[in-house]
């Protein structure tokens, strides 16, 4: 049994999703968004750190997975996204959680079956996979997708290596 916290980072909205993995079953635990104020970036980064630290205390996850930075046309946006990711990763490492990172293509492939899936397709599949009554908000669905991707990656590695331990994958020390 493992509780996985998935995070879709953003400097304005950071999505989070928590699933409990029991055997081959993925059970929805919770999800939502951390919406930062329109204050200066350092204050928003602290809000992300504090928000995720509280979520970690509330849900007590065993593993932490986050979406990797993508290349953006706007360098300033990419830098802010990288800083938001950093705040999220520090919250995880402060709680001694192993950190895994996945690209958007890996996440979409794990959830939908194609790395070129649209946001609406990810939302629909997350609703189906986790048996939710309605589709979650886009950022929360993306975060749940990160958690589902991590679960599938762990299952695949374990199948390949017997008792492979993916906790070392992407771990920050």
From Swiss-Prot:
Arranged from A to Z, the UniProt key words for this protein are: Cytoplasm, DNA damage, DNA recombination, DNA repair, DNA-binding, Endonuclease, Hydrolase, Magnesium, Metal-binding, Nuclease
Q: What is the required cofactor set for this protein? A: Mg(2+)
**Co-factor: note:** Binds 2 Mg(2+) ion per subunit.
Chain coiled-coil ranges:
none
Q: Provide the residue positions that the database annotates as binding Mg(2+) 2.
A: 67
Catalytic function, reaction form: Endonucleolytic cleavage at a junction such as a reciprocal single-stranded crossover between two homologous DNA duplexes (Holliday junction)
The EC designation for this entry is: 3.1.21.10
GO biological process terms, semicolon-separated: DNA recombination; DNA repair
Provide the residue positions that the database annotates as binding Mg(2+) 1: 8, 139
Q: Where is the active site?
A: 8, 67, 139
InterPro entries per record = RNaseH-like_sf, RNaseH_sf, X-over_junc_endoDNase_Mg_BS, X-over_junc_endoDNase_RuvC
Gene3D superfamilies the UniProt entry points to: Ribonuclease H-like superfamily/Ribonuclease H
Cell compartment(s), UniProt: Cytoplasm
A Gene Ontology term for the protein's cellular component: Holliday junction resolvase complex
Which top EC class applies here?
A: hydrolase
Molecular function GO terms recorded: crossover junction DNA endonuclease activity; DNA binding; magnesium ion binding
Q: Which family does it belong to?
A: Belongs to the RuvC family.
**Its job:** The RuvA-RuvB-RuvC complex processes Holliday junction (HJ) DNA during genetic recombination and DNA repair. Endonuclease that resolves HJ intermediates. Cleaves cruciform DNA by making single-stranded nicks across the HJ at symmetrical positions within the homologous arms, yielding a 5'-phosphate and a 3'-hydroxyl group; requires a central core of homology in the junction. The consensus cleavage sequence is 5'-(A/T)TT(C/G)-3'. Cleavage occurs on the 3'-side of the TT dinucleotide at the point of strand exchange.
Quaternary structure, from the entry: Homodimer which binds Holliday junction (HJ) DNA. The HJ becomes 2-fold symmetrical on binding to RuvC with unstacked arms; it has a different conformation from HJ DNA in complex with RuvA. In the full resolvosome a probable DNA-RuvA(4)-RuvB(12)-RuvC(2) complex forms which resolves the HJ.
Task: Give the protein's recorded name.
Answer: Crossover junction endodeoxyribonuclease RuvC
């Amino acid at each position: 049994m493992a509780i996985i916290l998935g995070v879709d980072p953003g400097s304005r909205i950071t999505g989070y999703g928590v699933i409990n993995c029991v055997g081959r079953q993925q059970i929805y635990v919770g999800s939502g968004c951390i919406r930062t104020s329109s204050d200066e970036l350092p204050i928003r980064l602290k809000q992300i750190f504090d928000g995720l630290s509280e979520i970690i205390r509330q849900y007590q996850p065993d593993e932490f997975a986050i979406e990797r930075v993508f290349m953006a046309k706007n360098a300033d946006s990419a830098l802010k996204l990288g800083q938001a990711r950093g705040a999220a990763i520090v919250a995880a490492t402060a709680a001694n959680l192993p950190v895994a990172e996945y690209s958007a293509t890996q996440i979409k492939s794990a959830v939908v079956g194609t790395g070129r899936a649209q946001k609406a397709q990810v939302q629909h599949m997350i609703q189906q996979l986790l048996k939710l009554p309605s589709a979650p908000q886009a950022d929360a669905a993306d975060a749940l997708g990160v958690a589902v991707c991590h679960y599938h990656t762990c299952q695949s590695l374990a199948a390949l290596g017997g008792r492979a331990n993916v906790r070392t994958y992407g771990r920050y020390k």
